[in-house]
Amino acid sequence: MEKRTTYCGNVSAEFIEKEVVLKGWVQKRRDLGGVIFIDLRDREGIVQVVFNPEKSKEAWEIADKCRSEYVIEVKGQVVYRDKEAINPKMKTGEFEVMATDITILNTAKTTPFTIEDDNNVNDELRMKYRYLDLRRPSMTNNIKLRHQVTKTIRHYLDNHDFLDIETPYLGKSTPEGARDYLVPSRVHAGHFYALPQSPQLFKQLLMGAGFDRYYQIVRCFRDEDLRGDRQPEFTQIDIETTFLTPEEIQTYTENMLAEVMKETKGIEISVPFPRMSYDEAMARYGSDKPDTRFAMELIDVAEVVKDVDFKVFQAALENGGHVKALNAKGAADKYSRKDMDNLGKYVSQFGAKGLAWLKVEEDGLKGPIAKFLTEVSDELIAATNAEVGDILMFGADKPEIVAAALGAVRTRLGKELGLIDESKFNFLWIVDWPLFEYDEEAGRYVSAHHPFTQPKAEDVDRLATDPASVYAEAYDVVLNGYELGGGSLRIHTRELQEKMFETLGFTKEEAQDQFGFLLDALDYGFPPHGGIALGLDRLAMLLAGEENIREVIAFPKNGKAIDPMNNAPSLVSPLQLFELNIDVTAIDE
């Protein structure tokens, strides 16, 4: 084999009248009037190669044997195409290579699907033949984009004195958060390592060790139910610092993201990002990760409807709940009664009992609940800024149910009504988070982020007496309705960390058993510290304009956490189980 001159997709005017050696895959072969044209593809793109029997009979005869996905090496001269043959849709559309020599490096069977973007192949088949799927230009470009993101991040953090430090994959299982993936120890029978859900404690210990600024682009593992933007193994951009305020950590983060946007998309974004408290986000958008690319907001109408004779509204208000509305401007004729019934069923997954609604017509409000609101119709129209052609949708229940239901409806309407400007990248900080959430099923408070989050100084005294009122030095960065990442200042004294564990229901013995190494470390002069972790997969997905992180991961799992290509997970041999002292008692095939 001869040395390659350049990539197929990089053939340009620089190579005119020069001889080049190209290597790649046959995208397409055409025989036109005795002249063979091959579209030769590699990771950088496609170039047209011409085989004229008058130029080289031997090369023409070999080219005639080529079929799609054959791997070939071509030598020839780069020339300009005739004007009528220029293809403006191709990066190399002005040029072609007049071949003088060709070598078939490997043949290929007929592929189970065509190697092109618009092939309408189901996801399971794509994943079974992932190595073929990755040859498609869109997938190749997604993986290259991901590389550009990580390259830019490393460059930025290196330039700001962050150290890239690896942390262990084999660690200790802890009860907080999602389920762990466990790894049995052969040497220590009955004992298990856990694959890390994040390097949280290790990066805190690195701060205690004095490294000051740490980062790692690190693989993490969570055994949880999957959805479009989640995988059992995923990649975090993990950052930790000492002696910085939340605002300083946020500044580093947003400047890093601005650099990523500039390098990958050629877009200059404004910094600092807007900031919004958690309470404000929930009140205005019904979401802690609002999509601010469109303006529809939740409207509190409790004062307007507090005296109406509608039991649903009254019951909610009497029990300390909320009554809120959404105004879908100009959407009345787009949603039938059946559509509204379907929306009512949709919100049931968020705990709502239904979705009340009204349409604004020339002669007033019309709909299933209009008769209950006759006396306040003018006030309701004013409060919601309603006009003829609008449709009002109402949630009445516990505050968290109203927020979740209407927030989800808002997001759905934004997509269905085409309200979202897909060209926008709206970044946002959500700050001032509650430190705890109440788990109804467990009957106790759990960490809203993780148990190492620093409470706001003014709230510490209420940790034991009123946990629900305690706020955290925590912050999430949001992009277009997706949580990109979250961070916080961390607890750096043993006394406060023990109080935190106590509030979460740990006994002293449990805390020492599970987190004793951290508690002991806090006795040795731990500095104030904090950081953030960002989802690389999700960031790459949004930059690529995809809707599923599988599209930016080279070898992902499917919705059942299975790799259809290599059939992982799989059964293992009895000998392997015996060596690990594991007895599998029952398998549901």
UniProtKB/Swiss-Prot annotation:
EC numbers: 6.1.1.12
Chain intervals for the UniProt region annotation (Aspartate): 200-203
Reactions catalysed, as given in the entry: tRNA(Asp) + L-aspartate + ATP = L-aspartyl-tRNA(Asp) + AMP + diphosphate
One annotated Gene Ontology cellular component of this protein: cytoplasm
List of residues binding L-aspartate: E176, R222, H449, R490
One matching Pfam family: tRNA-synt_2
Function: Catalyzes the attachment of L-aspartate to tRNA(Asp) in a two-step reaction: L-aspartate is first activated by ATP to form Asp-AMP and then transferred to the acceptor end of tRNA(Asp).
Entry protein name: Aspartate--tRNA ligase
